[in-house]
């Protein structure tokens, strides 16, 4: 299992939101590439970048910061989400060197878009599903749906997506611990690898996930915990490597 540092971009700055609310923002750095360098120097094997403005506006907004990071670390896999709403945008990111495209809202509202992306960019598409009490939310978590996250995930098994990022909205940015039960429940019922996200607080969450890693949990995304220091990134990755 790999530990993936999150770099959430808003107005060119590195921030974290609480429960996906744009008005509840903490700025951790005004220099995203400096932030990326810090995690790379600590041994990050992948970076998770999110264009928060893009997620809300439906188009790339922080693409300059994203391409700068990708260019600075050409051998490092980078996954990007937020505002990827058509093939042209996806192609621009792939040509810039992005390794994986994260599709959130469009995966829920237009499943054919995911199928098309998978045909165009094999093994480079990650579906990001944000859920609250087992039901999917879209449009930067603003819009709740009546779609069950397990049922929706199963629909992507035939497309050949790389993985699913499962984020528990109720826990994200709240530093209350991960909802491991919900993550494992999803992982058990689908064949697609899972990247867990939302609520990681300390090394205890890593330990709990590692006991369930055989169900197909390939990675965990962490943001606020590594920025506020309640989780030591190097220690977390070392623990994963030893198990």
UniProtKB/Swiss-Prot annotation:
Pfam families attached to this UniProt entry: His_biosynth
Compartments, record wording: Cytoplasm
Keyword Cytoplasm appears in the UniProt entry: yes
Domain of life of the source: Bacteria
Catalytic activity: 1-(5-phospho-beta-D-ribosyl)-5-[(5-phospho-beta-D-ribosylamino)methylideneamino]imidazole-4-carboxamide = 5-[(5-phospho-1-deoxy-D-ribulos-1-ylimino)methylamino]-1-(5-phospho-beta-D-ribosyl)imidazole-4-carboxamide
Active site: 8, 130
Keyword Isomerase recorded: yes
Cellular component aspect of the GO annotation: cytoplasm
Enzyme class, broadest EC rank: isomerase
HAMAP family: HisA
GO biological process: L-histidine biosynthetic process; L-tryptophan biosynthetic process
Source lineage: Bacteria, Pseudomonadati, Pseudomonadota, Gammaproteobacteria, Candidatus Pseudothioglobaceae
Molecular-function GO terms, alphabetical: 1-(5-phosphoribosyl)-5-[(5-phosphoribosylamino)methylideneamino]imidazole-4-carboxamide isomerase activity
UniProt organism field: Vesicomyosocius okutanii subsp. Calyptogena okutanii (strain HA)
NCBIfam families tied to this protein: 1-(5-phosphoribosyl)-5-[(5-phosphoribosylamino)methylideneamino]imidazole-4-carboxamide isomerase, PRK13585.1
Pathway per the UniProt entry: Amino-acid biosynthesis; L-histidine biosynthesis; L-histidine from 5-phospho-alpha-D-ribose 1-diphosphate: step 4/9
Signal peptide (residue range): none
Family indicated by similarity: Belongs to the HisA/HisF family.
Its EC number(s): 5.3.1.16
Name the record gives this protein: 1-(5-phosphoribosyl)-5-[(5-phosphoribosylamino)methylideneamino] imidazole-4-carboxamide isomerase
Keywords: Amino-acid biosynthesis, Cytoplasm, Histidine biosynthesis, Isomerase
């Amino acid at each position: 299992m790999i530990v993936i540092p999150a770099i959430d971009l808003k107005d060119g700055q590195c921030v974290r939101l609480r429960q996906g609310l744009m008005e509840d923002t903490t700025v951790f750095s005004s220099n995203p590439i400096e932030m990326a360098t810090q995690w790379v120097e600590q041994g990050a094997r992948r970076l998770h970048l999110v264009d928060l403005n893009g997620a809300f506006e439906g188009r790339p907004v922080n693409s300059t910061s994203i391409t700068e990071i990708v260019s600075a670390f050409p051998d490092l896999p980078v996954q990007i989400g937020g505002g990827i709403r058509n093939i042209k945008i996806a192609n621009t990111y792939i040509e810039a060197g992005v390794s994986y495209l994260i599709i959130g809202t469009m995966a829920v509202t237009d499943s054919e878009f995911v199928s098309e992306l998978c045909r165009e960019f094999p093994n480079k598409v990650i579906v990001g599903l944000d859920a609250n009490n087992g039901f999917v939310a879209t449009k930067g978590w603003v819009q709740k749906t009546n779609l069950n996250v397990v049922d929706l995930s199963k629909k992507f098994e035939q497309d050949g997506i790389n993985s699913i990022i499962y984020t528990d909205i109720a826990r994200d940015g709240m530093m209350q611990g991960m909802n491991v039960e919900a993550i494992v429940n999803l992982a058990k019922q689908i064949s697609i690898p899972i990247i867990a996200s939302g609520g990681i607080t300390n090394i205890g969450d890593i330990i709990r996930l590692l006991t369930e890693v055989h169900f197909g949990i390939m990675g965990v995304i962490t943001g606020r915990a590594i920025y506020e220091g309640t989780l030591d990134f190097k220690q977390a990755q070392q623990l994963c490597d030893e198990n």
